[in-house]
A protein has these predicted regions:
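Pyridoxal 5′-phosphate
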Residues: 1-383
Length: 383
């Protein structure tokens, strides 16, 4: 998608470049579906029909009913809606169990609930970056109203077995709500909603624009759902505000575009990840933070020499674009690496490279070349 051969974008976990065909769908929708979908006249009816079609298309990729799919502005909004909108509907207990490396949009709503008297149990990841599902299950009891666990970690790429987690949670307490943040997983790994009650996805991680996402909310929870904010009856009254129809159509186009190619894209991206791992293996200082079973789209490592911000600035000057941690935690050290027990030097020198299927071996080679130059040059300056 990039036309500049000297520019190498390797930060796809932060955001992806909008696909040209998705941009075309949005542009067309802005011109043709300008009416409010709630309006009763003919243009409004056509907009409503288009919105329903977009909803159905996105729902198909998740394997849910159209009426269980709600458009949001992003994954963060979806997480807030899911957590704050369901927790207070459960009156049989105050227990909440959550993994220790969730996105801030999961952490902070749960911190608010903790301040309101809920008992939040945080299960830290293991030293290798994996999550012990059994430890989460051990924390579930008759008073547990909610369990939250991301499917793929946004910083190190850990893939969590949320299907097993959800099934086992329901066996222990069928009334417990299971929430899954699938923002980094959607269109990267297969998704099954069995035993999962709420799930969030986001458009800008799959080559749709920023500003559009979706929340899956099991139909059995709708009647008791308490939306955090109130307004009109859009999205069945659960997410008020005039719908962003052009972006909803763009989300549907992006999801449909990728839905049939998960396996082939996984193979292509895995080859890039392997190439990068092999290239990094020649640096004795480098320590890989991503666990062996991580999704291939994300490779996090610490170079244990140069502060991340310094190395990122060097690479950016060479048009190599990567990151040090989650874009949503800008300027903050990685809470994921801290939860894993990494030492301060490893945290301060961490770099995240994240791929999409549009990346090439040349992107990897360019990164490795500029990274090697940076290690030599910046260490000389440091001395």
């Amino acid at each position: 998608m990039l036309h500049d051969p000297e520019l190498h974008y390797l930060d796809n976990a932060a955001t992806t470049i909008v696909a040209p065909e998705v941009a075309e769908v949005i542009d067309k929708a802005m011109r043709e579906h300008w009416a409010n979908p709630s309006s009763l006249y003919a243009p409004g009816a056509r907009s409503e029909e288009a919105l329903n079609a977009a909803r159905a298309a996105v729902a198909r990729t998740l394997g849910c009913k159209s009426k269980e799919l709600y458009f949001t502005s992003c994954g963060s909004e979806g997480n807030n809606l899911a957590l704050l909108g369901t927790a207070q509907t459960r009156t049989f207990g105050k227990g909440i169990v959550v993994s220790g490396f969730e996105h801030p949009s999961v952490q902070r709503p749960l911190e608010r609930l903790a301040a309101q008297g809920y008992n939040v149990t945080v299960v830290k990841p293991q030293a290798d970056g994996t999550l012990d599902i059994n430890k989460m299950l051990d924390a579930v009891d008759k008073n547990t109203i909610l369990v939250a666990c991301m499917m793929v970690n946004n910083e190190i790429g850990t893939r969590n077995d949320v299907e097993r987690l959800a099934a086992e949670v329901k066996r222990r307490n069928s009334r417990t709500i299971v929430h899954v943040d699938a923002v980094q997983a959607w269109m990267r790994v297969p998704i099954k909603l069995d035993n999962i009650d709420t799930m969030t996805v986001s458009g800008h991680k799959i080559h749709a624009p920023k500003g559009i996402g979706a929340l899956y909310l099991s139909d059995r929870l709708v009647q008791a759902f308490q939306p955090p904010y109130l307004g009109g009856e859009q999205e069945r009254g659960l997410r008020p505000g005039t719908e962003n129809l052009p972006y909803a159509l763009g989300l549907a186009a992006a999801a449909t575009r990728l839905a049939g190619s998960i396996k082939s894209r996984d193979k292509a991206v895995r080859a890039l990840n392997d190439r990068l791992r092999a290239g990094l293996s020649v640096f004795p200082e480098v320590e890989i933070n991503s666990p062996a079973g991580a999704v291939p789209e994300v490779l996090n490592f610490s170079e244990n020499c140069i502060k991340s911000e310094t190395m990122l600035a060097w690479l950016s000057e060479k048009q190599i674009y990567v990151s040090s941690a989650s874009a949503c935690g800008r300027g903050q050290p990685s809470h994921t690496l801290a939860a894993m027990g990494r030492d301060p030097l490893a945290i301060d020198t961490a770099i995240r490279v994240s791929f999409c299927a549009d990346n090439t071996p040349e992107d990897v080679d360019a990164f490795l070349e500029r990274f090697e130059d940076g290690m030599k040059h910046l260490q000389r300056i440091k001395k």
